[in-house]
Amino acid sequence: MVAMEKCEPKYEPRCRIFFAEGQKFRTNLLVLFFDLPLKRETATKTALLAEVLRQGEDPTGAARQAELLFGAHWDISVVKKGGRQLLLFSLETLKNVETEEMLAFLRERLFAPMQNGFTEKTVERQKKILRQKLENQRDDKKAFARRRALEETAKGTALAISGDGYAEDLEEIGAEGLLAFYRELLETARVQVFFCGEKDEALLSLRQNF
């Protein structure tokens, strides 16, 4: 098991950073996630945000750029953990890629929307994709039955809420509202960063962004 080392100041920071020794591995892994309370009114926005940020204006751009620059795997996803919803950014690169390069790529993906915004075209495209994913889940009878059972047994709690969002909530989400939600998330959400590789103090500079 890989031991994790916390690197924390004396006060409780909004951005917490953990290092894991990874010299024996062939790649470096950088994971950043926003830790959000799982609520019905924001669950679908968060799930859609992951779709929009992953694809952006160019459906193959970010992933292709990461592959060309770093021989890397890049992804954004949403994970449900108990009563929390995690918006997760992950970048896995070859060992010869500098930590500063990884951070520059991550920052570009994180903060470019604050300058460029989201277009209605992109948001509508990703809404269709997310809606199809959610409808496909309903077609999986066993998975749908498990989800319905959880909704009933955990009724009235965050555990009953789907971390994948709800198709019926997509219609009311537009580009402007989604950008406002993302801006608030960047300014207020708890952030955790995990890095598996050779320890580099450059990672601590992420705290300046949150």
Placement of each model-derived feature along the sequence:
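N- or domain-start disorder-to-order transition segments that initiate the globular core
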Residues: M1-N28
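Hydrophobic side chains in well-ordered alpha-helices
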Residues: E101-M102, F181, A202-L206
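Acidic/histidine-enriched alpha-helical segments
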Residues: A112-E135
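Histidine-acidic residue clusters that define the catalytic metal-binding segment
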Residues: V2-K10, L150-V191
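M16 family metallopeptidases and their MPP-like homologs
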Residues: F18-A20, F25-E51, T60-F111, A143-E168, ...
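A common structural junction motif
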Residues: L106-G117, L206-F210
